[in-house]
Amino acid sequence: AAGVSLGLMYEPGLYADTEELKKVVKLCCKYNKPLTVHPRAESKVSMSYDSLFGRSHLLRAEDELVEISKGTNLKLQHSHAIFVGRQSFGDKGEFVAIQNSLRENGVDAMFDIYNETLGVSVITVVLPVWYQGMSKEERKKPLNKLKLSVLIKATSILLGFGFKDIQIAYIGPGYEKYEGKTVHEIAKENGKSDLDMYLQLCEESDFKGRVNMGPYSTPEIIREFEHNPNCLYMTDAWVEDFGVQNPAIYDCYPKFLRDSLRGTGDTLPNTVRRMTGATADRFMLKDRGYVKPGYFADFTVFDEDETKNATPDQTKSFGIKKVFINGELVLDNDELNKSALKTTGRALTV
């Protein structure tokens, strides 16, 4: 195995308790494999904890990672450092302090970021665990719906995040009319409350719909983390067959390069390394990430001037001139060799 990846905010990870997680940590340490964790909460308040008040849920989730890794040399990858909702931005300082403390106490802790202030999630991300576990009949009971309504409204106020910030990316065949619109916009068009429309969308997607939402971060936080020595770069994106795409698929990495060339990001060598060699090292990928004899020739050629002066967020990439996968040219300027693209990639052995 390459390691273990946990999504503690989602099923089935959200049901894992501390003792079970400690066993996973022990296993990773035994075989010197990384544990990549999407924490239980990445916002000031969330549906992962019962109490809406007191310590930030984001920081409680960090406390859990501290607890399960205490006294170990675990290779812990926090994926990813985001702060969902405007009221969560203030947790950034303590988040960094916790990461530093982990390292000071022997845990090989790192985190990663993407160069976007929004992100993609499943439509159920704002539904509490107890509601998701109910039968359809139980969900229809007025008392349960009232409890849910009060909880979501309170969370929205405390978080600085609401249905106006949740854009539908995909519900399913026949529901294309919803794509690209916020839950609030769809509710208004259908003469329903935001909550009723949201629950209907959950049902129509069989609770598997996809959403784009934010804010997850700020340009200032991203700029700061670009200089943090324990931060790697990633996209958190993949091309979907249907619906609205995650904007990060187009220009997330070019934007990191653009920041570097404009002097707001890390140095260019460090920026490239965070995307390549440092990531290969972190996940122990053999013969990847470096330009060395005997290594696989995975190259991206970019135009510095074009990258530096481009306008980002235009649903297209910029600055990338050539891409080689395993030594074969798959992108030459704007011409994509689809045949080569299908055959040049390979599963990585670890």
Positions of predicted regions on the chain:
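Hydrophobic, small-residue-rich alpha-helical packing segments that form membrane-like cores
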Residues: A1-G71
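Generic beta-strand/beta-sheet core signal
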Residues: G7, T36-R40, S79-A81, F111-Y114, ...
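Acidic, glycine-enriched loop/beta-strand segments at the rims
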Residues: G209-I222, T267-V272, A280-K316
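Acidic, glycine-rich active-site loops and adjacent beta-strand->loop/helix elements
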Residues: Y10, A41-S43, I82-V84, A278-T279
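Gly/His-enriched, cation/cofactor- and phosphate-binding structural elements
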Residues: Y253, R258-D281
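C-terminal cap of metal-dependent C-N hydrolases
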Residues: E137-R139, R223-N230, T235-D236, P247, ...
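Mid-to-C-terminal alpha-helical segments outside catalytic/metal-binding sites
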Residues: L195, N270, R274-A278, D298, ...
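Active-site neighborhoods of metal-dependent hydrolases
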Residues: A1-L14, S51, V66-K70, L74-T264
